[in-house]
């Protein structure tokens, strides 16, 4: 397959044109859009291109089981970005960092977990050092929700309710009167469950995912490329986990913990941005 001709990372991206990533093995256009794959040792990570766009971040007042910190407000992301189609796996982690911190180590396709925000930043720093010209980072909270929603406005990218065939959550606690489902008591290997409409797997459930931002209340005004406050005490977590009720896997759910804390249900997902 012939790779599309892409501009360099320094090319202005106002029109949402995907930028090239040095060292990418190939670019593929499929039903989900454009993707690229990076090789790090024996590990491979696919990234999906998300175009710039505007969306409503947070949840409407009538959304069942919403949290108090989910003020609905308009957000515009003015630049496109590449986002990993899965959480960082243990295989990818071990290709960069020699010690696997995870509790569930029986499958290298499992998401890495038991990771502090600071651990993720050290991993990313080493990854960027090894892959010259690559600018990996954590997603901002706004980028994360934009990617999770994949153009939807419902509580989940799959619709107004979900089952454990779609999301790995504590199935004894379904969403808004839904039927109980499986409680797997552990994370699943990535790509086990269906992708959202933009080709991203397990954005809901499985493991919490760190975001770049310090946690703060949402503003009432429309925002362009929000990045959170400059200082804070807690970093943002998104997505819910295998051990939580379904409500915590909603696209709008926000959580936060201290960046040095290492819960065994927390991992992260990479974004590639222009330097």
Describe the predicted segments one by one:
Residues 36-38, 59-78, 177-179, 185, ...:
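Short, polar loop/linker segments at the starts of domains and inter-domain junctions
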Residues 50, 56, 60-61, 103-106, ...:
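Functional-site microenvironments in short loops/helix caps that host divalent-cation chemistry
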Residues 82-86, 113-116, 193, 259-263:
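Aromatic-acidic/polar surface patches that form glycan- and anion
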Residues 3, 14-49:
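GGW-centered surface loops in extracellular recognition modules
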Residues 2-15, 19, 194-196, 229-275:
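Disulfide-stabilized, aromatic/cysteine-rich ligand-recognition loop
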Residues 88-96, 122, 244, 248, ...:
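Generic alpha-helical secondary structure signal
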Residues 37-101, 116-118, 205, 274:
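A short glycine-rich, aromatic-capped structural motif
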């Amino acid at each position: 397959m012939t790779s599309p001709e892409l501009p360099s990372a320094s090319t202005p991206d106002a029109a949402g044109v995907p930028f090239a990533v040095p060292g990418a093995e190939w670019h593929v256009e499929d039903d989900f859009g454009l993707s690229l794959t990076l090789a790090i040792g024996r590990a491979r990570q696919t990234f999906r291109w998300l175009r710039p766009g505007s969306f409503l971040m947070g949840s409407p007042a009538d959304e069942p089981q919403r949290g108090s910190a989910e003020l609905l407000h308009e957000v515009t992301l003015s630049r496109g970005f590449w986002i990993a189609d899965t959480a960082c796996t243990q295989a990818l982690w071990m290709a960069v960092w020699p010690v696997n911190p995870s509790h569930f180590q029986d499958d290298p396709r499992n998401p890495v977990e038991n990771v502090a925000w600071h651990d993720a930043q050290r991993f990313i720093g080493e990854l960027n050092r090894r892959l010259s010209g690559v600018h990996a980072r954590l997603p901002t909270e706004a980028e994360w929700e934009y990617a999770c929603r994949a153009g939807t406005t419902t509580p989940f990218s799959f619709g107004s309710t979900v089952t454990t065939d779609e999301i790995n959550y504590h199935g004894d606690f379904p969403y808004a009167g839904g039927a109980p489902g499986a409680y797997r008591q552990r994370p699943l290997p990535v790509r086990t469950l269906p992708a959202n409409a933009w080709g991203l797997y397990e954005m809901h459930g499985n493991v919490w995912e760190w975001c770049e931002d310090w946690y703060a209340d949402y503003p009432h005004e429309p925002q362009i490329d929000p990045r959170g406050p400059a200082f804070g005490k807690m970093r943002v977590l998104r997505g819910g986990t295998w051990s939580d009720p379904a409500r915590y896997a909603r696209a709008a759910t926000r959580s936060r913990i201290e960046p040095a804390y290492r819960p065994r249900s927390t991992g992260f997902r990479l974004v590639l941005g222009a330097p």
